[in-house]
Structure formats: structure tokens, C-alpha cells
Amino acid sequence: MGFEELLEQVGGFGPFQLRNVALLALPRVLLPLHFLLPIFLAAVPAHRCALPGAPANFSHQDVWLEAHLPREPDGTLSSCLRFAYPQALPNTTLGEERQSRGELEDEPATVPCSQGWEYDHSEFSSTIATESQWDLVCEQKGLNRAASTFFFAGVLVGAVAFGYLSDRFGRRRLLLVAYVSTLVLGLASAASVSYVMFAITRTLTGSALAGFTIIVMPLELEWLDVEHRTVAGVLSSTFWTGGVMLLALVGYLIRDWRWLLLAVTLPCAPGILSLWWVPESARWLLTQGHVKEAHRYLLHCARLNGRPVCEDSFSQEAVSKVAAGERVVRRPSYLDLFRTPRLRHISLCCVVVWFGVNFSYYGLSLDVSGLGLNVYQTQLLFGAVELPSKLLVYLSVRYAGRRLTQAGTLLGTALAFGTRLLVSSDMKSWSTVLAVMGKAFSEAAFTTAYLFTSELYPTVLRQTGMGLTALVGRLGGSLAPLAALLDGVWLSLPKLTYGGIALLAAGTALLLPETRQAQLPETIQDVERKSAPTSLQEEEMPMKQVQN
């Protein structure tokens, strides 16, 4: 008897599992609150050089600014430069100082803002960009973008650490570590007195939050039977969408970055308390030889699900026999993903797809400027559009297949980026429509990637394969904010980069085998039974056909 038979006896889907899904919903909601927080936390409002000495009774403010600030090529006043000396104005003497110093050339000299900046606080009372003594604008705007990169780099490192530690010490114990670490580091970030302190604490917060991404899914699915895992996975993914929309509301109500950071961090406190009711994975306990504790959790599951169990077939001795079969002989490594030709082909393609999915998703999600809506409306709309995109994925993977859905959603993302390049900056409505379409396609690509990748890898390497692709995906997420800095080279270059990477990932997805209506591979031999695809015709994995 294996673990699946044990789970069938105690109930693979019932009140016990539903309670578990509900208790693990909080981490899924917290993830987008932190991952997409830079939209509000690092927002850069309209700003200009601080210009002390403006006449208190000066009635023509715009004219006075014209004398002190140069204009950009698009006609707007510069945010980062001022004239070295005020320019002459009609009926004023503001230009006399300039003329007396011999500044008679056609192009007046300009200098950087030496006395700080003045910010428009109509939308944000404060962000890390406007923080006193930080001023992460103009020459320092790279540090503003780098804060997001540091955060996602922390997520990448944390994923590796939590993946190993949760296998070594258990899911529930490491989930507690993730909760406590996120709470402490989040509070420290909100109290940062310097940019360096903020960057360090946010990086460590990202590492702590990685525990949620690595632990919650296995802890939830390992208590579910095979039949209900897909339903539970789709249900759980809606919690992320709920967090995306909740962020818009929280950001609207709290305009100060320190209080906003506190608001998205403090829910970790009730999360810590909720762990009292979250069970450890019985499957993991059996692999570690903790038979007594696993037996206790299984009996509790049976009681909550109203399942009577036979004492003879469900004794601690019977569970011990199952444990002997569940013990891990050798832990797989990342190298196992590249040892055989077919598996190597799948791994290389999945790496490119996951990098493209994350790079384009976060590139689009973190860029809410230049649209016809304010940042709060845009974020709410971006969250709301994720719900129909999940329905699109559900229908498409059933009838068109996983491979075409993955390629099609990435192609749609690339086309949305490319079309936005053709729309002029004054066509706000069209820019908004294209951005929303791109967000829907990128979310659909993300959802498909999780399903498709898990079906490509054999059971013995599935967790390892998902770990590798998630690792590379987080690398793409960490580079996405930095790609936005390419606008200093050419204004359209960031969108061209995001779209180009998405297009490359779409083409790569077509090189993967189709898994629709195919049984999940169990061993490496199952995967290697057929050579890598050489055409774009639909292929079926060489296993028995099952109901989708």
C-alpha cells in the first residue's frame, strides 16, 4: 500500500483539505502585495529643481519657472536641470545677472539640481524616491529601480535556501520561519533611516517571502488526491489575483510608503497564529521516518473528513510499511535534468520560457505610467483582468493544448508590447487598452507555465525541474526593473526588449512536446521514450491517455 491509498482511506478531498487551503490563502495574498509593491513604494511623482528665493507675491509662477528651468525636447520643463543663471523675462530684471556675467551664447548653461527637488504630492504623500536625503530621481533613479532588483535577487536566493531547508526540516517549520522573518524584516524596512538599510532589509524580505512561494504549494497539494489537485491549484491562483486588486485599494488608502509597507507586512502576525491549525505534510513525515506524527495527522484528517478507518489496515505498523516505501534513497540534483537528451531539451526550453514569462510579466506589471488612468485605477484593472485570463487558459489548454496555449499567450504579450510602440503618447485610451491586453496575456502565460512545466517533468524530478525553472524565472523578474532604465538610451527600448524576450520565449515554447490528454511521466525513461520534437505538429507524450 502506498501513500495515495492511505490518503484515499482518510479522504483526499474534504473539510480537512478545504481548511488547509483556506489557512494557506494568506501567504498567496501577501505575495503580490510585496512583489508588486514597488508600483507605489518606488513611484516617482512629477518633480523639478528646488528654487529658493521665489518672490512671495509673484503672480506669474509659470513665467518665473520658465526663467529658471530649461525645456525638454517634448516641451515640458526639465525635472533634473536648471539654468546656471536666470533667463531674461519681459519687464523684469531677472536676466541682468546672467548678462552681467557674459552669458550671451545662444544655448544658456544648465546645471544639475544642487539644492534638492520639489515634488508633486497630489498622488503620493511620500515614496522612497521622494524621501528626504534620498531623492532617488535624475542621476539617482538607477538606485530606485535597483531596489526592486535587490528584492527579486533576494527572492532568488531565498528560493534555493527554503527549497533545501524545507526538505530537510519540514514544510510547516520553515513556513513559520518565513512568516517571522517577513514580519521582522518588513518592520525594519519601514523604519529604514538610509537607502542602504532599506535595500538590505528589502533584499532579506524577498528571501523570506520566497519561503511562501516554495512551501505553500507542496504543503497544500501533498494532502490532496490527484483528482482534486487541479481544482485546488486554480482556486489557489485566484488568491494571487485577489492580492493584486487588494494592493490597489491599500495603495489608494495609504499614500505614505512607510505606513504602506507596514500595512502589507503586519498580516504576517495572524499568519503566524494560523500555523497552529496547519498540518505538516504527512508524505514528508513518512519520507523522514516520522511515522508516529504522520499517523496522528492522518487520523485527524480522517476524523474531520468523517471517514471511518479500519484499525488493522490503518495501524501505526501499517503506516510504517508505507513509510519504508516513501523513504528517499537519493535526492535528485539539478544535474539530473541535463543528463539525458530529451530531458535536457525540455529543461533548456523551459528555462527560456520561464525567463520570458517572468521578464515580460513584471516588466508590464511594474510599468503603469503613460496610461489614461491613474496608478490606482490601473492596478485595479490589471488585477481584475487576471480573472478572465485564467478562464481563457482553462479553456485553451483543454482544447488547443498546452504548447499552443503557452506559445500563443506569450505571442499575445509580445504583440501588445510591439503595438504600444506604434501608438503615440497622446493616445492614452489606446495605450491603456493595449496594456490591459498585454497584462491578460502575460498572466495567462504565467498560469500556463505552471501547469505545462509540471506535466513535462517526470515524478522523480518534478520538484527539481520546477525549482530550476522558478529560479531562472526569478532571475528574469529581478532584471525586469533594470530594463526600464534603457529608456535613457531610447525611449521605446524597454518595451522593445520586453516584447522581444516574450517573442523568443513564444518560439521556444513551440519546441516543447504536447502533454494534453497524456498521463504524467513517472520516470526518466518515460520521458526519453520519444526523441525531441522536430516539427511543430502536435505531439502526445508517449504514455497512456487519460481524462484531461
UniProtKB/Swiss-Prot annotation:
Region Disordered: start-end pairs: 522-548
Membrane-spanning intervals of the chain: 21-41, 146-166, 180-200, 204-224, 234-254, 259-279, 346-366, 376-397, 404-423, 432-452, 466-486, 493-513
GO molecular function, one term: organic anion transmembrane transporter activity
Record keyword Cell membrane present: yes
Sugar attachment sites: 91
Disulfide bonds: none
One of the protein's GO biological processes: alpha-ketoglutarate transport
The reaction(s) this protein catalyses: glutarate(in) = glutarate(out)
Keyword annotations of the record: Cell membrane, Cytoplasm, Glycoprotein, Ion transport, Membrane, Transmembrane, Transmembrane helix, Transport
One of the record's GO cellular component terms: basal plasma membrane
Pfam family, one: MFS_1
Tissue and organ expression note: Mainly expressed in liver and kidney. In kidney, expressed in proximal tubular cells. Also expressed in pancreas, small intestine, spinal cord, lung, brain and heart. Expressed in fetal liver.
Stored SUPFAM superfamilies: MFS general substrate transporter
Stated family: Belongs to the major facilitator (TC 2.A.1) superfamily. Organic cation transporter (TC 2.A.1.19) family.
Protein name: Solute carrier family 22 member 7
Species of origin: Homo sapiens (Human)
Gene assigned in the entry: SLC22A7
